[in-house]
Amino acid sequence: MSHSRYYFTSESVSEGHPDKVADQISDAVLDEFIKQDPNSRVACETFVTTGQVIVGGEVTSKGIVDVQTIARKTITEIGYTKGEYMFDANSCGILSALHSQSPDINRGVDRKEEIADEFDRVGAGDQGMMFGYACTETPELMPAAIQYAQELVRLLAEIRKEGKIMTYLRPDAKSQVTLEYDGNDNVLRVEAVVVSTQHDPEPAGMSEAEFQAVIKNDVIENVIKKVIPAKLIDENTKFHINPTGRFEIGGPHGDTGLTGRKIIVDTYGGAAPHGGGAFSGKDPSKVDRSAAYAARHVAKNIVAAGLADKCTVQVSYAIGVARPISIYINTHGTSKHGLSDEQIQEKAEAIFDLRPLAIIRRFNLDRPHGWCYRDTAAYGHFGREQFPWEKTEKVAELKAALGL
């Protein structure tokens, strides 16, 4: 293995970023449909811009959802509640353009024949490939750069909502973390942290430069140093806080937001492959979402069981077909106990049922308890213990199957 050092970078965005506003509205609409009718089929897309929200997509459900009320509630909770933001929950226009799903798709998902057991009853909602990943870089078994990037913007939002310090904060923000690794893929240190946060105008009597200096110090002391372990920060670590200076205009007024445009933020920060399908606004019959959750579950249990230090899982489907077309597991040369990837994959395939209905039942994706889909729509779908696909309950079964 090479011993040359290298850098790796991941980014995240806050719940107030326009693309994340769109994701959260889409998932809040999905939550309401699922709550009223667990068998709802939903593909909900949201567009947000200055003073306007458009919600569209395809739905088959017995539920009746007030899209306007849900969108305004979501925007309020994110924090867009002032007219000066040019995107205000109370005054923005909201257009709903949801319509019924194609019966051709529904026919493929709800199968009526070729059934060996009940889990063969539901075919995949579309073709495609999905990836899951886990590694030992953090306690959450997530890549470190994305984990830190998510925690930075999450803490920034908590501080903003608490309103005790940094009272100038506005909802939009981004983070980026660059780590230095040794040739054995161990994190050595933080090379750079970038945080851009929207803020109020500078107070009277304070120049832009003075205000930005205050913001920089506050972000370093109250956010970065609370999230990133002190041992990883040294005198050469670079902090770029609002590097362009003033950041007053932001959110959907600064940039148009769309559902599904932050798929790398949602997953592993570029540390693992991505099948290309977004998550938010999609009911669990859509394998873009449910199978990506299941693939993470498989990868995390393999790493948690001590079978490998890294694990990538790929699963693929054909529309209307329940059983995966292919499953692929790669431990990147980090497998333990003399195990081959083939041995690990053989046991994993026997233990983890990756048919869509089996995934839905295993995680109660049609009846979420203790979480909701909107919870997933900001700060990452993985590495957060509240979600059932993060459980490592299969560790003992995996180890026993492999004679460990």
From Swiss-Prot:
Q: What is its main location?
A: cytoplasm
Q: Which GO terms describe its molecular function?
A: ATP binding; magnesium ion binding; methionine adenosyltransferase activity
As cofactor, the record names: Mg(2+); K(+)
Where do the annotations place ATP binding?
A: 17, 172-174, 246-247, 255, 261-262, 278, 282
Please tell me whether the keyword Nucleotide-binding is annotated for this protein. Answer: yes
Q: Which residues bind L-methionine?
A: 58, 101, 255, 286
Q: Does the keyword ATP-binding apply?
A: yes
Where is the region Flexible loop? 101-111
Can you tell me which residues bind K(+)?
Answer: 45
Q: How, per the record, is the cofactor bound?
A: Binds 2 divalent ions per subunit. Binds 1 potassium ion per subunit.
List its EC numbers: 2.5.1.6
| GO terms for biological process, alphabetical | one-carbon metabolic process; S-adenosylmethionine biosynthetic process
CDD domains, per database record:
S-AdoMet_synt (cd18079)
The protein's role, per its UniProt record: Catalyzes the formation of S-adenosylmethionine (AdoMet) from methionine and ATP. The overall synthetic reaction is composed of two sequential steps, AdoMet formation and the subsequent tripolyphosphate hydrolysis which occurs prior to release of AdoMet from the enzyme.
Q: What is this protein called?
A: S-adenosylmethionine synthase
Q: What species is this protein from?
A: Chlorobaculum tepidum (strain ATCC 49652 / DSM 12025 / NBRC 103806 / TLS) (Chlorobium tepidum)
